[in-house]
UniProtKB/Swiss-Prot annotation:
<dbReference type="GO" id="GO:0030145">
    <property type="term" value="F:manganese ion binding"/>
</dbReference>
<protein>
    <recommendedName>
        <fullName>Peroxisomal coenzyme A diphosphatase NUDT7</fullName>
        <ecNumber>3.6.1.-</ecNumber>
        <ecNumber>3.6.1.77</ecNumber>
    </recommendedName>
</protein>
<dbReference type="GO" id="GO:0005829">
    <property type="term" value="C:cytosol"/>
</dbReference>
<keyword id="KW-0576">Peroxisome</keyword>
<dbReference type="GO" id="GO:0044580">
    <property type="term" value="P:butyryl-CoA catabolic process"/>
</dbReference>
<comment type="subunit">
    <text>Monomer.</text>
</comment>
<feature type="short sequence motif" description="Nudix box">
    <location>
        <begin position="77"/>
        <end position="98"/>
    </location>
</feature>
<dbReference type="InterPro" id="IPR045121">
    <property type="entry name" value="CoAse"/>
</dbReference>
<dbReference type="GO" id="GO:1902859">
    <property type="term" value="P:propionyl-CoA catabolic process"/>
</dbReference>
<dbReference type="InterPro" id="IPR000086">
    <property type="entry name" value="NUDIX_hydrolase_dom"/>
</dbReference>
<feature type="binding site">
    <location>
        <position position="96"/>
    </location>
    <ligand>
        <name>Mg(2+)</name>
    </ligand>
</feature>
<feature type="domain" description="Nudix hydrolase">
    <location>
        <begin position="37"/>
        <end position="172"/>
    </location>
</feature>
<dbReference type="GO" id="GO:0015938">
    <property type="term" value="P:coenzyme A catabolic process"/>
</dbReference>
<feature type="modified residue" description="N6-succinyllysine">
    <location>
        <position position="20"/>
    </location>
</feature>
<keyword id="KW-0464">Manganese</keyword>
<dbReference type="GO" id="GO:0030515">
    <property type="term" value="F:snoRNA binding"/>
</dbReference>
<dbReference type="GO" id="GO:1901289">
    <property type="term" value="P:succinyl-CoA catabolic process"/>
</dbReference>
């Protein structure tokens, strides 16, 4: 039974159905997949558990040269054999945590992120089963954990700072979350944190307790507007 006293399965289905309906309003498909950048994709795995929606995160292995020990979503660079950007995200999720493509229902592709003048990261939100047991690849992943989606709107520990990149000011959120299962505290920041905030707002439709990058009244248009401005600046430097 759920905390509401209702059977778990109907509660999960209701949560996921509502999430899908809201996310699909923000699906841009392959609108920007033609842009000439180095292509990366990430998967934001969404799971309904104990009457709440959660996001699944990984902690990068300390053995990795780039960003060791940082919290992120499963993802990586596109391979020539990947059919599209979504295939990249699914392949990387399988390699990193053992999540097979048939275990994911990809719901939407969000507005991509430009992290420098030549690297485009495309985020996908996918639903996964509440019974999924992660199998971290120790060469790439140190740990896997879940965070309630609502935490990214009303956190216990949050900070933010501003950075200027490609001629535009960006908000970088920094969250600290202590996993109640083992007491481990994780820091979630940068693009990963920003995407978590965006997805939480889209699905839960509640105002966050802090400033955000996007316009709360027109999330999609404001996200695309900023992306296109940064894209224009990036291409002018090539």
């Amino acid at each position: 039974m759920s905390r509401l006293g209702l059977p778990e399965e109907p509660v999960r289905n209701s949560l996921l159905d509502d999430a899908k309906a809201r996310l699909r309003k923000y699906d841009i498909g392959g609108k920007y997949s033609h842009l000439p950048y180095n292509k990366y994709s990430v998967l934001l795995p969404l799971v309904a558990k104990e009457g709440k929606l959660h996001l699944l995160f990984t902690v990068r292995s300390e053995k990795l040269r780039r960003a060791p020990g940082e919290v992120c979503f499963p993802g990586g660079k596109r391979d020539p054999t990947d059919m599209d950007d979504a295939a990249t995200a699914l392949r990387e999720a399988q390699e990193e945590v053992g999540l097979r493509p048939h275990q994911v229902e990809v719901v939407c592709c969000l507005v991509p992120c430009l992290i420098d003048t030549d690297t485009l990261i495309t985020p996908f939100v996918g639903l996964i089963d509440h019974n999924f047991q992660a199998q971290p690849n120790p060469a790439e992943v140190k740990d896997v954990f879940l965070v309630p989606l609502a935490y990214f709107l009303h956190p216990q520990v949050h900070d933010q700072h501003y950075v200027t990149r490609l001629g535009h000011r960006f908000i970088n959120h920094i969250f600290e979350y202590t996993n109640p299962e083992d007491g481990v505290t994780y820091q979630i920041k940068g693009m990963t944190a920003n995407l978590a905030v965006l997805v939480a707002f889209i699905i839960l439709e509640k105002k966050p307790t802090f400033e955000v990058q996007f316009n709360l009244n027109d999330v999609l248009a404001s996200s695309e507007e900023l992306f296109l401005k940064v894209h224009k600046k990036a291409t002018s430097r090539l």
